[in-house]
A protein has these predicted regions:
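Short, positively charged and aromatic/hydrophobic N-terminal segments
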Residues: 9, 23-26
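Long, low-complexity C-terminal extensions of enzymes
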Residues: 317-358
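Short helix-initiation/N-cap motifs at beta->coil->alpha
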Residues: 63-74, 127, 165-204, 343-353
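Secondary-structure end/capping motifs
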Residues: 254, 259-334
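Pocket-lining segment of extracytoplasmic ligand-binding domains
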Residues: 178-286
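Short, glycine-/small- and polar/acidic-enriched structural segments
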Residues: 36, 40-163, 167-174
Length: 358
Protein backbone atom coordinates (compact mmCIF):
# COMPACT_ATOMS: atom_id res chain seq x y z
CA UNK A 1 0.00 0.00 0.00
CA UNK A 2 1.30 3.43 -0.91
CA UNK A 3 1.31 5.91 1.97
CA UNK A 4 -0.89 8.97 1.55
CA UNK A 5 0.36 12.53 1.95
CA UNK A 6 0.56 13.36 5.64
CA UNK A 7 -0.06 9.72 6.57
CA UNK A 8 1.57 8.40 9.73
CA UNK A 9 3.36 5.17 8.84
CA UNK A 10 3.49 2.94 11.91
CA UNK A 11 6.25 0.44 12.70
CA UNK A 12 5.57 -3.24 13.05
CA UNK A 13 6.56 -3.52 16.70
CA UNK A 14 6.49 -1.40 19.81
CA UNK A 15 8.86 -0.66 22.65
CA UNK A 16 9.34 -2.83 25.67
CA UNK A 17 8.14 -1.77 29.12
CA UNK A 18 10.54 -0.57 31.78
CA UNK A 19 13.16 -3.16 32.71
CA UNK A 20 15.21 -4.01 35.75
CA UNK A 21 17.40 -1.58 37.65
CA UNK A 22 21.19 -1.80 37.32
CA UNK A 23 23.03 -3.82 39.93
CA UNK A 24 25.29 -2.16 42.50
CA UNK A 25 28.42 -4.25 42.91
CA UNK A 26 31.22 -4.07 45.47
CA UNK A 27 34.66 -3.73 43.88
CA UNK A 28 37.11 -3.94 46.74
CA UNK A 29 35.00 -1.92 49.14
CA UNK A 30 33.98 0.72 46.55
CA UNK A 31 30.40 0.66 45.29
CA UNK A 32 30.12 0.46 41.52
CA UNK A 33 27.14 0.43 39.16
CA UNK A 34 27.11 -2.61 36.90
CA UNK A 35 25.95 -1.85 33.34
CA UNK A 36 25.63 -3.90 30.17
CA UNK A 37 26.90 -2.26 26.97
CA UNK A 38 26.06 -3.12 23.35
CA UNK A 39 28.22 -1.61 20.61
CA UNK A 40 29.65 -2.57 17.23
CA UNK A 41 33.17 -3.83 16.76
CA UNK A 42 35.12 -0.57 16.35
CA UNK A 43 38.82 0.08 16.67
CA UNK A 44 37.99 3.15 18.78
CA UNK A 45 36.07 1.12 21.38
CA UNK A 46 38.49 -1.82 21.43
CA UNK A 47 40.15 -0.87 24.71
CA UNK A 48 36.75 -0.53 26.38
CA UNK A 49 35.87 -4.07 25.32
CA UNK A 50 39.27 -5.24 26.59
CA UNK A 51 38.76 -3.52 29.94
CA UNK A 52 41.79 -1.27 29.43
CA UNK A 53 39.73 1.94 29.50
CA UNK A 54 37.09 2.19 32.19
CA UNK A 55 34.54 4.64 33.50
CA UNK A 56 34.81 5.78 37.12
CA UNK A 57 32.18 4.16 39.33
CA UNK A 58 30.99 1.78 36.61
CA UNK A 59 31.58 -1.91 36.00
CA UNK A 60 30.81 -2.83 32.40
CA UNK A 61 29.83 -6.04 30.69
CA UNK A 62 30.51 -5.21 27.01
CA UNK A 63 28.70 -7.03 24.22
CA UNK A 64 30.35 -6.52 20.82
CA UNK A 65 28.21 -6.99 17.70
CA UNK A 66 29.21 -7.24 14.03
CA UNK A 67 26.38 -5.01 12.79
CA UNK A 68 24.24 -2.11 13.95
CA UNK A 69 21.04 -3.63 12.54
CA UNK A 70 20.81 -6.26 15.26
CA UNK A 71 21.65 -3.80 18.02
CA UNK A 72 19.05 -1.27 16.86
CA UNK A 73 16.35 -3.91 16.35
CA UNK A 74 16.83 -5.51 19.76
CA UNK A 75 17.28 -2.29 21.71
CA UNK A 76 14.31 -0.44 20.21
CA UNK A 77 12.17 -3.57 20.59
CA UNK A 78 13.18 -4.87 24.00
CA UNK A 79 15.71 -2.51 25.65
CA UNK A 80 17.97 -5.47 26.33
CA UNK A 81 20.98 -3.47 27.56
CA UNK A 82 21.67 -0.54 29.87
CA UNK A 83 23.91 1.32 27.41
CA UNK A 84 23.52 0.86 23.68
CA UNK A 85 24.68 2.19 20.37
CA UNK A 86 21.64 3.38 18.42
CA UNK A 87 20.80 4.79 15.03
CA UNK A 88 20.53 8.60 15.16
CA UNK A 89 17.41 8.44 12.99
CA UNK A 90 15.60 6.08 15.35
CA UNK A 91 16.59 8.11 18.39
CA UNK A 92 15.52 11.50 17.04
CA UNK A 93 12.18 10.11 15.88
CA UNK A 94 11.34 8.47 19.21
CA UNK A 95 12.46 11.57 21.12
CA UNK A 96 10.30 13.84 18.97
CA UNK A 97 7.27 11.73 19.88
CA UNK A 98 8.05 11.87 23.60
CA UNK A 99 8.33 8.07 23.79
CA UNK A 100 12.10 7.50 23.80
CA UNK A 101 12.93 5.07 26.62
CA UNK A 102 16.56 6.10 26.36
CA UNK A 103 18.67 9.27 26.55
CA UNK A 104 21.69 10.01 24.38
CA UNK A 105 25.19 11.13 25.19
CA UNK A 106 27.23 12.95 22.49
CA UNK A 107 29.42 9.95 21.70
CA UNK A 108 29.22 9.16 17.99
CA UNK A 109 30.83 5.78 17.31
CA UNK A 110 29.96 5.87 13.61
CA UNK A 111 30.34 8.97 11.43
CA UNK A 112 30.32 8.39 7.68
CA UNK A 113 29.94 10.69 4.68
CA UNK A 114 27.18 9.30 2.48
CA UNK A 115 27.60 10.46 -1.11
CA UNK A 116 28.81 6.90 -1.60
CA UNK A 117 25.41 5.49 -0.57
CA UNK A 118 23.51 6.19 -3.82
CA UNK A 119 23.54 3.23 -6.22
CA UNK A 120 21.98 3.38 -9.70
CA UNK A 121 21.39 0.89 -12.50
CA UNK A 122 24.14 1.39 -15.04
CA UNK A 123 21.67 1.42 -17.95
CA UNK A 124 19.11 3.71 -16.30
CA UNK A 125 20.58 6.91 -17.72
CA UNK A 126 21.00 8.55 -14.31
CA UNK A 127 24.05 10.79 -14.48
CA UNK A 128 23.21 13.58 -12.01
CA UNK A 129 21.21 13.85 -8.82
CA UNK A 130 18.39 15.69 -10.62
CA UNK A 131 17.99 12.64 -12.86
CA UNK A 132 16.50 10.83 -9.85
CA UNK A 133 13.33 12.89 -10.25
CA UNK A 134 10.59 10.89 -11.93
CA UNK A 135 12.25 7.60 -10.97
CA UNK A 136 11.56 4.84 -8.45
CA UNK A 137 14.18 4.75 -5.70
CA UNK A 138 14.56 1.98 -3.14
CA UNK A 139 15.33 2.54 0.54
CA UNK A 140 15.76 0.04 3.41
CA UNK A 141 13.86 2.35 5.77
CA UNK A 142 12.71 5.95 5.41
CA UNK A 143 14.13 6.58 8.88
CA UNK A 144 17.53 5.00 8.16
CA UNK A 145 20.05 7.60 9.23
CA UNK A 146 22.14 7.35 6.06
CA UNK A 147 19.05 7.94 3.92
CA UNK A 148 18.01 10.97 5.96
CA UNK A 149 21.38 12.61 5.27
CA UNK A 150 21.31 11.64 1.58
CA UNK A 151 17.80 13.03 1.01
CA UNK A 152 18.82 16.11 2.96
CA UNK A 153 21.79 16.97 0.77
CA UNK A 154 19.93 15.95 -2.39
CA UNK A 155 17.20 18.46 -1.55
CA UNK A 156 19.33 21.29 -0.15
CA UNK A 157 22.53 21.04 -2.18
CA UNK A 158 21.39 19.42 -5.44
CA UNK A 159 17.89 20.91 -5.72
CA UNK A 160 16.16 17.52 -5.97
CA UNK A 161 12.39 17.56 -5.36
CA UNK A 162 11.82 14.52 -3.14
CA UNK A 163 8.11 14.54 -4.01
CA UNK A 164 9.00 13.79 -7.64
CA UNK A 165 10.50 10.43 -6.65
CA UNK A 166 8.53 7.24 -5.95
CA UNK A 167 10.02 5.65 -2.84
CA UNK A 168 9.89 1.86 -2.35
CA UNK A 169 10.91 0.47 1.05
CA UNK A 170 12.32 -3.05 1.48
CA UNK A 171 15.26 -4.95 2.94
CA UNK A 172 18.52 -4.43 1.10
CA UNK A 173 19.24 -8.06 0.28
CA UNK A 174 16.42 -9.88 2.07
CA UNK A 175 12.64 -9.35 2.10
CA UNK A 176 10.66 -8.55 5.23
CA UNK A 177 12.37 -5.44 6.59
CA UNK A 178 10.04 -2.82 8.06
CA UNK A 179 10.21 0.63 9.60
CA UNK A 180 11.06 0.71 13.31
CA UNK A 181 9.50 4.09 14.10
CA UNK A 182 6.31 5.92 13.18
CA UNK A 183 6.65 8.30 10.26
CA UNK A 184 4.73 11.49 9.58
CA UNK A 185 5.32 11.77 5.86
CA UNK A 186 5.20 15.23 4.27
CA UNK A 187 2.50 16.11 1.78
CA UNK A 188 3.34 14.85 -1.68
CA UNK A 189 5.73 12.08 -0.68
CA UNK A 190 4.92 8.78 -2.43
CA UNK A 191 6.10 5.93 -0.21
CA UNK A 192 5.30 2.24 -0.54
CA UNK A 193 6.50 -0.60 1.74
CA UNK A 194 7.43 -3.77 -0.16
CA UNK A 195 7.88 -6.53 2.43
CA UNK A 196 7.59 -9.19 -0.29
CA UNK A 197 10.91 -8.42 -1.99
CA UNK A 198 14.34 -6.82 -1.57
CA UNK A 199 16.01 -3.73 -2.94
CA UNK A 200 18.59 -5.86 -4.73
CA UNK A 201 15.87 -7.85 -6.48
CA UNK A 202 13.99 -4.70 -7.53
CA UNK A 203 17.21 -3.11 -8.76
CA UNK A 204 18.05 -6.20 -10.82
CA UNK A 205 14.56 -6.36 -12.36
CA UNK A 206 14.42 -2.64 -13.09
CA UNK A 207 11.51 -2.03 -10.72
CA UNK A 208 13.69 0.62 -9.09
CA UNK A 209 16.34 2.66 -10.87
CA UNK A 210 18.35 3.53 -7.78
CA UNK A 211 18.90 2.50 -4.18
CA UNK A 212 19.94 4.70 -1.26
CA UNK A 213 21.47 2.51 1.43
CA UNK A 214 24.33 2.42 3.91
CA UNK A 215 24.84 -1.22 2.93
CA UNK A 216 25.57 -1.88 -0.75
CA UNK A 217 22.99 -3.88 -2.72
CA UNK A 218 24.00 -7.34 -3.91
CA UNK A 219 24.32 -6.22 -7.54
CA UNK A 220 27.11 -3.77 -6.74
CA UNK A 221 30.22 -5.76 -7.61
CA UNK A 222 32.08 -3.45 -9.95
CA UNK A 223 30.76 -5.02 -13.16
CA UNK A 224 28.81 -1.99 -14.31
CA UNK A 225 25.28 -3.31 -13.79
CA UNK A 226 25.02 -1.22 -10.62
CA UNK A 227 27.24 1.85 -10.14
CA UNK A 228 27.53 4.73 -7.73
CA UNK A 229 25.88 8.01 -8.66
CA UNK A 230 29.06 9.74 -7.45
CA UNK A 231 31.96 7.59 -8.77
CA UNK A 232 34.50 9.91 -7.12
CA UNK A 233 32.48 10.11 -3.93
CA UNK A 234 35.39 11.19 -1.73
CA UNK A 235 35.84 14.39 -3.72
CA UNK A 236 32.09 15.09 -3.53
CA UNK A 237 32.08 14.44 0.21
CA UNK A 238 35.09 16.69 0.80
CA UNK A 239 33.42 19.54 -1.11
CA UNK A 240 30.25 19.03 0.92
CA UNK A 241 32.17 19.09 4.20
CA UNK A 242 34.14 22.22 3.28
CA UNK A 243 30.94 24.02 2.29
CA UNK A 244 28.65 22.95 5.14
CA UNK A 245 30.84 21.74 8.00
CA UNK A 246 28.63 18.64 8.17
CA UNK A 247 30.34 15.36 9.06
CA UNK A 248 27.36 12.99 9.22
CA UNK A 249 26.68 11.26 12.53
CA UNK A 250 25.22 7.80 11.93
CA UNK A 251 25.01 6.39 15.45
CA UNK A 252 25.19 7.68 18.99
CA UNK A 253 25.42 6.06 22.39
CA UNK A 254 22.32 5.94 24.55
CA UNK A 255 21.45 5.00 28.12
CA UNK A 256 18.23 3.33 29.15
CA UNK A 257 16.17 6.15 30.63
CA UNK A 258 15.32 4.36 33.88
CA UNK A 259 19.02 3.75 34.48
CA UNK A 260 19.96 7.35 33.70
CA UNK A 261 17.28 8.71 36.02
CA UNK A 262 18.65 6.58 38.88
CA UNK A 263 22.28 7.50 38.19
CA UNK A 264 22.52 10.70 36.09
CA UNK A 265 26.25 10.99 36.83
CA UNK A 266 27.01 7.97 34.65
CA UNK A 267 26.37 10.01 31.49
CA UNK A 268 29.51 12.13 31.78
CA UNK A 269 31.60 9.26 33.10
CA UNK A 270 30.65 7.14 30.10
CA UNK A 271 31.39 10.06 27.77
CA UNK A 272 34.89 10.43 29.22
CA UNK A 273 35.50 6.70 28.85
CA UNK A 274 34.55 6.65 25.17
CA UNK A 275 36.53 9.83 24.50
CA UNK A 276 39.66 8.38 26.09
CA UNK A 277 39.35 5.15 24.10
CA UNK A 278 39.07 7.19 20.89
CA UNK A 279 42.10 9.30 21.82
CA UNK A 280 44.19 6.18 22.33
CA UNK A 281 42.98 4.78 19.02
CA UNK A 282 44.18 7.84 17.10
CA UNK A 283 47.52 7.74 18.88
CA UNK A 284 47.93 4.16 17.63
CA UNK A 285 46.92 5.03 14.08
CA UNK A 286 49.45 7.86 13.89
CA UNK A 287 52.31 5.73 15.21
CA UNK A 288 54.82 4.95 12.42
CA UNK A 289 56.78 2.46 14.56
CA UNK A 290 54.82 -0.52 13.28
CA UNK A 291 51.76 -1.28 11.15
CA UNK A 292 48.86 -0.82 13.54
CA UNK A 293 46.39 -1.60 10.76
CA UNK A 294 47.27 -3.57 7.59
CA UNK A 295 47.15 -0.66 5.15
CA UNK A 296 50.18 1.11 3.64
CA UNK A 297 50.57 4.78 4.62
CA UNK A 298 47.79 4.49 7.20
CA UNK A 299 49.61 6.76 9.65
CA UNK A 300 50.25 9.32 6.91
CA UNK A 301 46.58 9.20 5.96
CA UNK A 302 45.62 9.85 9.58
CA UNK A 303 47.89 12.91 9.62
CA UNK A 304 46.46 14.10 6.29
CA UNK A 305 42.89 13.83 7.55
CA UNK A 306 43.78 15.59 10.80
CA UNK A 307 45.19 18.46 8.74
CA UNK A 308 41.83 18.90 7.03
CA UNK A 309 39.55 18.21 9.98
CA UNK A 310 41.57 19.66 12.84
CA UNK A 311 43.44 18.06 15.73
CA UNK A 312 40.40 15.92 16.59
CA UNK A 313 39.10 14.70 13.22
CA UNK A 314 36.40 12.52 14.78
CA UNK A 315 34.92 14.69 17.52
CA UNK A 316 32.60 13.68 20.30
CA UNK A 317 30.72 16.34 22.27
CA UNK A 318 28.12 18.83 21.08
CA UNK A 319 29.90 22.05 20.10
CA UNK A 320 32.30 20.61 17.52
CA UNK A 321 29.37 18.81 15.91
CA UNK A 322 26.68 21.46 16.30
CA UNK A 323 26.42 22.17 12.55
CA UNK A 324 25.94 18.47 11.86
CA UNK A 325 23.36 17.94 14.60
CA UNK A 326 21.37 21.04 13.62
CA UNK A 327 21.35 19.95 9.98
CA UNK A 328 20.14 16.49 10.95
CA UNK A 329 17.35 18.00 13.04
CA UNK A 330 16.30 20.01 9.98
CA UNK A 331 16.52 17.08 7.57
CA UNK A 332 14.54 14.78 9.88
CA UNK A 333 11.80 17.36 10.35
CA UNK A 334 11.52 18.21 6.66
CA UNK A 335 11.26 14.51 5.78
CA UNK A 336 8.69 13.59 8.42
CA UNK A 337 10.99 11.38 10.47
CA UNK A 338 10.34 13.59 13.49
CA UNK A 339 6.89 14.66 14.63
CA UNK A 340 8.09 18.11 15.70
CA UNK A 341 11.13 20.26 15.00
CA UNK A 342 13.92 19.16 17.32
CA UNK A 343 16.79 21.22 18.72
CA UNK A 344 20.19 20.17 19.97
CA UNK A 345 19.09 20.66 23.58
CA UNK A 346 16.13 18.33 23.01
CA UNK A 347 18.50 15.47 22.23
CA UNK A 348 20.97 15.46 25.12
CA UNK A 349 20.53 15.86 28.90
CA UNK A 350 22.07 18.87 30.67
CA UNK A 351 24.67 16.62 32.30
CA UNK A 352 26.56 16.23 29.00
CA UNK A 353 25.90 19.51 27.20
CA UNK A 354 29.05 21.16 28.52
CA UNK A 355 32.52 19.72 29.02
CA UNK A 356 34.97 20.73 31.72
CA UNK A 357 38.33 21.90 30.38
CA UNK A 358 41.61 22.17 32.27
Amino acid sequence: MTARAGHVQKPTHGLAPELRSPTIVDTGGVASVHLTLAVCDYEHVREIAQGLVRADGITLTPLIFPSIEEITFRFTKSLEWDVSELSFGKYISLTSQGIAPMVAIPVFPSRVHRHSAIYVRGEAGIRTAKDLEGRAVGIPEWAQTAGIYVRGFLAEEEGVDLAKIRWLQAGVNEPGRAEKVELKLPAGIRYQPRPDTSLSAMLASGEVDAVISARAPAGFAGGGEVVRLYPNYRAAEERFFRKTGIFPIMHLMTIRRTVFEQHPWIAMNLFKMFDEAKRRCFNRLRDFTCARIPLPWAAAMADEIAAGYGPDPYPYGIEQSRATIEAFCRYAHDQGVTHRRMTVDDLFPPEVRALARV
